[in-house]
Amino acid sequence: MIRPEFFIEKLRENGIDCYAGVPDSLLKNICAYITDHCDEQHNIIAANEGAAVGIAAGHYLATGKPACVYMQNSGEGNIINPLASLTDQEVYNIPVLLLIGWRGRPGVHDEPQHVKQGKVTTGLLNVMGVNYEVLSKEEDKAEKQIVKAIKALQNKEVFALVIEKDTFEDYKLQNVEVNDLAMSREEAIQTVAAALGEKDCIVSTTGMISRELFEYRAAKGQGHEKDFLTVGSMGHASQIALGIAMAKPDRKVWCFDGDGAAIMHMGSMAIVAQKAPKNYVHVVFNNGAHDSVGGQPTVGLKIDLPAVAKAVGYKAAISMSSKEEMEKELSTLNSQLSTIGGPILLEIKVKKGNRKDLGRPTTTPIQNKEALMAFLKN
């Protein structure tokens, strides 16, 4: 395997010292090393992958030096437009080094949401005219691939290094941003889920939130038909919930969101607000971290999410960080929806981390979809 310090030093020797991106589980060791060894001016954890390409382009325009964009392959969709209309050699001709974690590689077992993306990862690069190398796990071979990448950048090309599982040696994040919040996300999810009505449904975002909701239902002996577990498509749970809420105005629809996911496509909040579904509750479990992929920080706890929600038109927005506050707000929520309508935002600040024995959904995405559709139909 490759030592993270070896890889980053080779990039530094060749003039690459600026990074932007969205953390990925396959890249967690290299992302952790970058977080520990680059200041905030040279490592920007972006809202989404397309935004990271924009940051890299801006860095090049200002310095003449290419930047490195790190991401999971699930984020390829977010970079298609800036690759085609910003960095492409027929447009602005801006070099960028892409570091792409290859989830769902053919022949390697992975979760359902990664299978299709894994199949098309290199094909998308080919279609976009992006040359790439699957990074070797041997340092001497990897060094030669880095040299090839640097030559491409010198020719003002975009070049991708595609990263398989277990490419980088373990590296534990040292500069961990610890919040002093007492409540776990799992406890918060259980508290909200327990307050739901019989006809209510939940759209939960990707990562730990959906996994913890699934386990709550299982522990209570309940079915999963009321929950749409958005195992992929990060950042879009609020819009899935909006689509349901508008089509089913007689049902209360809850979006269980994370801070990283909400920030990824924050403009969606404005659309929710302007459509103003009276049956829509947007719950953001905010721990200030990309918890599912290594714990790298988000700006979640550094911004005022309720103020953002109110500014775009949410009828109410409340922040809380204790079970007592939650139970108080949840007890009056129905009357608030009846009086002022929706959407309403509930920001619940929670501590980082999850149970080590946390499982994954045992139903398939298709089974989950069909059960929810039957529930909504009845």
What are these regions (language model features)?
Residues 1-126, 130-242, 246-251, 299, ...:
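Thiamine diphosphate
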Residues 71-74, 251-262, 267-269:
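DG-centered beta-turn motif at the end of beta-strands
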Residues 84, 93-96, 266-286:
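A short alpha/beta connector and helix-capping loop motif
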Residues 157-162, 341-348:
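Active-site regions of oxyanion-processing enzymes, predominantly non-cytosolic
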Residues 202, 253-256, 283:
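Residue-level marker for buried hydrophobic side chains located in beta-strands
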Residues 279-313, 319:
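A contiguous pocket-lining binding segment that forms or flanks enzyme active sites
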Residues 331-341:
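Short, basic, low-complexity termini and linkers enriched in Ser/Thr/Gly/Pro
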Residues 348-355, 359-361:
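Low-complexity intrinsically disordered segments
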